[in-house]
Amino acid sequence: AFSPLSVMVDYDAENGWACKLLPVVCGVLTVPLPSARRFYKFGKSLRQAILSYPEDIKVAIAGTGGLSHQVHGEGCGFNNPAWDAEFMERLEQDPESLLDMTVTELARLGGWEGAEVVMWLMMRGALSAKVECTHKTYFLPSMCPIATMILEERSDDLPAEAPAETVARANRDYAGAEDLAGTYPF
């Protein structure tokens, strides 16, 4: 799936983007590839960090990466629209059913580059358990499907650790670090 940021967010040459951006870059095409579960857990940690932020801010999380496709070898040109539809449905309704899938299983269903769906799992991990899909499209123009989903939170479930506890733990872990001679941790 492609994410043309310039279509979704205003940009001008003088002031830059109309919002603050924090890209999280994930390498998913060379081994060792982190597991689907690990990407999902990273998303859960990202949610914890966002909820612990001291200001009340609006946050949008974009998960990018191709659905089924393969661009090399004898499998070049492979697509699996049925798997793409199943993945998108499970991502919305039951993301944890995807977490024990191996990289090999993801590649078998979606082509080697189709394992990029783990980045969608990172985004989903950052959302509450209950979401509503308010927009979904899927188009297969050639080598790689183009798909979008907008998932909106429908519950306020909080992580196991309260946001204030996360902040207190971070402050405790780094207390005094600024006083270490010859180091610049902040």
What does each of the following model-derived ranges do?
Residues 24, 57-67:
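Beta-strand elements within well-structured catalytic alpha/beta cores of enzymes
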Residues 70:
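Glycine-rich nucleophile elbow surrounding the catalytic serine of serine-hydrolase chemistry
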Residues 43, 63-65, 145:
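Glycine-centered flexibility sites
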Residues 44-59:
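Non-transmembrane, aqueous-exposed alpha-helical and coiled segments at domain scale
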Residues 1-41, 52, 73-185:
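Flexible, D/E/H-enriched segments
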